[in-house]
Amino acid sequence: MSNHIVVSSVSYAPVSGTDQEVMEQTHKDLKDLVGRAARATRPDLIVLPETICRNCDEEMPEGPTTQLLASLAREYSCYITVPVHQKERKSGAVFNVLGLLDRQGELAGIYRKYIPVYPEFDHGTRPGPGASLIQTEFGPVGGVICFDLNFGELRAQYKKLKPKLLLFSSMYHGGLVQNFWALDVQAFFVGSVYKGTPCTIIDPQGTTLAQSNNYQSWATARINLDYEVVHLDKNQAKYDDIHRQYGEAVRIVTTGEVGTSVIYSETEERTAADIVDEFELVRLDEYFDWSRQLRTEHLT
């Protein structure tokens, strides 16, 4: 069944100064920026860039930045990421994290940066365990933080977990690697980065749907998380039958050059998986697995 949500990724340029000055200015900026983005786009989810409050290590959920964003999540009734340095109360360990607050301002879950960049280790930041999913009302989501984007093993972990949505919180952009993550994991990718490069929203075929720009500090898109990814081979000949039977209730998006399609359910009566099963479509991973098997059979 269709699962539409509005997602917004917001850019920000962290400030400098004493720890107290940084916190006060950052909190003031966040109230303004999140408020403007939320009023303009009415999002279900807002993604913010990495370690948004510099030198503001805090416990979660009681830390000041977490509490500020929790109040904004409640005010605007949306999920909001919390990109901070989390300090554990018992051990004193520090992690670079992407927390996720729900519409009530409650902490839904935390993703810890898999591989911090080397200066972070010098400052005591510890690595996270790897891919993990945070449960939300619109399905499980995965987190990725900055330098993590470079490591294929983390992407492979997410590929096995099969989230429909990846949240990327970062200092740097990553360029086409963002699009490859979306394509390879077959997930929507919402990237929030520091000002100077665009925030992005990318679909499961690696197509960029929306970007921020020099005039607007956020990117916004309405996306449908009820989808299945298939290859054109063995499937394309059936598309006309699907359209004939279901019309606008099923949307098929085919990206040029890549050789894939995304099947979206646009109705409450059936899921995209139901459509795939009814018309015996072959999912992308199944097609690749079958192709590998076929190769093995023809080696001898």
Tell what function each PLM region has.
Residues 2-5, 41-44, 75-79, 139-141, ...:
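Loop/turn elements at helix/coil->beta-strand transitions in domains of secreted/extracellular proteins
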Residues 4-19, 23, 112, 140-148, ...:
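Active-site-proximal beta-strand elements of phosphoester/diester hydrolases
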Residues 4-11, 22, 37-39, 45, ...:
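Ligand-binding pocket scaffold of soluble enzyme catalytic domains
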Residues 10-12, 48-51, 83-86, 113-114, ...:
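Active-site-proximal beta-strand/loop segments in catalytic clefts of secreted hydrolases
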Residues 19-104, 172-173, 180, 184-185:
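Cys-nucleophile CN-hydrolase/nitrilase-fold catalytic domain and related Cys-dependent amidase chemistry
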Residues 63-81, 149-253:
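CN hydrolase (nitrilase-like) catalytic-core segments centered on the catalytic cysteine
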Residues 89-161, 170, 176, 184, ...:
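Active-site catalytic loop in hydrolytic enzyme cores
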Residues 226-300:
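A short C-terminal boundary segment appended to hydrolase-like catalytic domains
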